[in-house]
Amino acid sequence: MARSLPFPAAFPAARPRRLRRDAFTRALVREHSLSSSDLILPVFVHEGENLAAPIASMPGVSRMSLDLLLRTADEAVQLGIPVIALFPAIEPHLKTVDGAEAFNPEGLIPRAVRALKSRFPQLGVLTDVALDPYTSHGQDGLPDESGYLMNDATVELLVRQAMTQAEAGADMVGPSDMMDGRIGAIRQAFENAGHIHTRIMAYSVKYASGFYGPFRDAVGSKSALGKADKKTYYVDPGNSNEALREVATDLAEGADMVMVKPGMPYLDVVRRVKDEFGVPTFAYQVSGEYAMLKAAAANGWLDHDTVMMESLLAFKRAGADGVLTYFALDAARLLKKA
């Protein structure tokens, strides 16, 4: 970071408001900006045809069948959004203790990947590597008799899931499970299979946060999880040095990009990661963050577009190279009008 210097002059020789006087000057000296290419659009997919299921806790967001996914992707491409991130809402009868549907080559996500890459080869497709949408217990891995997740056995399943996604044509995989060693295992499997171009966006710093509730509604894991939590594998919200260790480990194991999740409550961590490592760094504006802003805007307490754009710009100012956000389409539409 640049060394802090004293301001060279005092009032009235220095009048900082001169640089705020009009729109062209403010634009000229603006330090950070937001564009559509900074946005990644998360989408929830489910089975069916011409079927959209609104998510009550995420106003404006729906689970969508694959035909509707393609319509959404078309708009994303037209707006200049470079990447779509896929998340599945799996039928309850397909959920098992080991989440085996996660590595079914004819499963929902592989079919969604193939459909997207066939229709929009220029669109990046990011897939989620985690078992919680597929497990009957709502956890991100394979539990032992006490309910504690078995790390190494889970990693073996995650490798199978990541390989299934890569073979379907995913450009990027996003391991969000927080198991130890999973990045290295996935990278080695990719190398062995010749998937040398498949990128890994590691959810390196995923906090044990209360902001994930609406997402769990969306993928149908909330009821399965019940009153259990994920504190034995997600990062403690009080820790930031630990976050840096997680990032260092994932980079050493072969991650191409890293992520901090949630976003706004952890902008300090985004800044530390970017300053310490200087690698492509992303933040996830998670479902709870989105829901809070939506609720406040719906009640007239905040202006929707203003706080949406301000919140996204905050990620860029903190050092993020891009943002996964459910506001992606709305923000890109607004940017196009500007």
Model-found features: residue ranges?
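Exposed beta-strand/loop interface patches that mediate assembly or binding
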Residues: P12-R18
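Acidic, Ser/Thr/Pro-rich intrinsically disordered transcriptional activation regions
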Residues: R18-T25
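Alpha/beta enzyme core
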Residues: A2-A10, D22, E31, S35-I40, ...
